[in-house]
């Protein structure tokens, strides 16, 4: 079971989220059949979305779009406050060579572009916020977004590690944020600790990477666990939802599908589930429009 643990320092100067997103990213890889580089890029974006959604309340939904300049295309993820996230990459079969040490490169793979966050509070008029991709590594781009767009100094680390067969081995990350009222010496102490932290890849390799992350963030400093919540890859598509989408098409288009194709097959981009609509379904839609 994947989870996110929310914590706050005893002094109230900082808060930290730590995540185990292994099954989330593994499910995404299985559904989209992504190559190594696209698995890591999509996985990091899914984790980034889980972090952002954990910061919201109510029925808020967050869409993250990593709009890079490479042949990978856009990475699009959607997360809600109930722990659900879904996502896809436009060209999952695109891949680049690993480094000599076997490292999967993401920054050069994603390229230059924009980090777009769409926040939908469920009341209409979603709020869009855009910052440039500063590295394409996703974690650094999320930290820059939080610092620039939300005016909250943040440190982010996230990664996806693959095994010898390029299958997801472990995935997770962390967010650390300065809270209002933090003293200069507290900020300096935490900044030093973050700078001296082992690489996120090293921490994820630990037997219990959640505890390893918390230890690296807080050291010997006291902190409180505020909550532990389940997170997962979960798509909200359905036959009914796609039926409603078809209903928005002109009757002439529906008639053409009925007569020439004898139905239509639709595949959800987010989870690759396929839905079939036969002539009877299309006839019903046409009749409802008349």
From Swiss-Prot:
One cellular component term (GO) for this entry is: cytoplasm
Per the annotation, which location comes first and is thus the protein's main one? Answer: cytoplasm
Q: Which cysteines are joined by disulfide bonds?
A: 235-237, 268-271
| Entry-linked SUPFAM superfamilies | Hsp33 domain, HSP33 redox switch-like
Q: How is it modified after translation?
A: Under oxidizing conditions two disulfide bonds are formed involving the reactive cysteines. Under reducing conditions zinc is bound to the reactive cysteines and the protein is inactive.
> Has keyword Disulfide bond?
yes
Name a biological process GO annotation. protein refolding
InterPro entries noted in UniProt: Heat_shock_Hsp33, Heat_shock_Hsp33_C, Heat_shock_Hsp33_N
Pfam families per the record? HSP33
Keyword line:
Chaperone, Cytoplasm, Disulfide bond, Redox-active center, Zinc
| Presence of keyword Plastid | no
A Gene Ontology molecular function term for this protein is:
protein folding chaperone
- Compartments (UniProt record): Cytoplasm
Record's PANTHER family? 33 KDA CHAPERONIN
Q: Which HAMAP family match?
A: HslO
Report the sequence similarity comment from the record: Belongs to the HSP33 family.
What is the documented function of this protein? Redox regulated molecular chaperone. Protects both thermally unfolding and oxidatively damaged proteins from irreversible aggregation. Plays an important role in the bacterial defense system toward oxidative stress.
Q: What is this protein called?
A: 33 kDa chaperonin
Which source organism? Streptococcus pneumoniae (strain JJA)
Q: Which gene encodes it?
A: hslO
């Amino acid at each position: 079971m994947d989870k996110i643990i929310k914590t706050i320092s005893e002094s109230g100067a900082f808060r930290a989220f730590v995540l185990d997103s292994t099954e989330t990213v593994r499910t995404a890889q299985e559904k989209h059949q992504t190559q190594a580089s696209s698995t890591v890029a999509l996985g990091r974006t899914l984790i980034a979305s889980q972090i952002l959604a954990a910061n919201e309340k109510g029925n808020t939904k967050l869409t993250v779009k990593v709009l890079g300049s490479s042949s990978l295309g856009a990475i699009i993820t959607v997360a809600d406050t109930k722990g659900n996230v879904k996502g896809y990459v436009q060209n999952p079969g695109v891949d680049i060579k690993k480094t000599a040490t076997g490292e999967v490169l993401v920054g050069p793979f994603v390229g230059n572009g924009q980090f777009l966050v769409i926040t939908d509070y469920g009341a209409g008029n979603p709020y869009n916020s855009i910052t440039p991709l500063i590295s394409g590594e996703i974690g650094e781009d999320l930290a820059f977004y939080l610092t620039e767009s939300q005016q909250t100094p943040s440190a982010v680390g996230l990664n996806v590690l693959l095994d010898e067969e390029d299958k997801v081995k472990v995935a997770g990350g962390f967010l650390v944020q300065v809270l209002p009222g933090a003293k200069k010496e507290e900020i300096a102490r935490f900044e030093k600790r973050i700078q001296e932290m082992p690489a996120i890849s090293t921490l994820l390799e630990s037997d219990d990477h959640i505890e390893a992350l918390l230890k690296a963030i807080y050291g010997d400093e006291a902190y409180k666990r505020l909550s532990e919540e389940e997170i997962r890859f979960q798509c909200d598509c359905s036959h009914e939802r796609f039926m409603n989408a078809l209903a928005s098409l002109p009757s002439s288009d529906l008639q053409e599908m009925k007569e020439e194709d004898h139905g239509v097959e639709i595949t959800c981009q987010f989870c690759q589930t396929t839905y079939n609509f036969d002539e009877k379904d299309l006839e019903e839609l046409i009749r409802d429009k008349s």
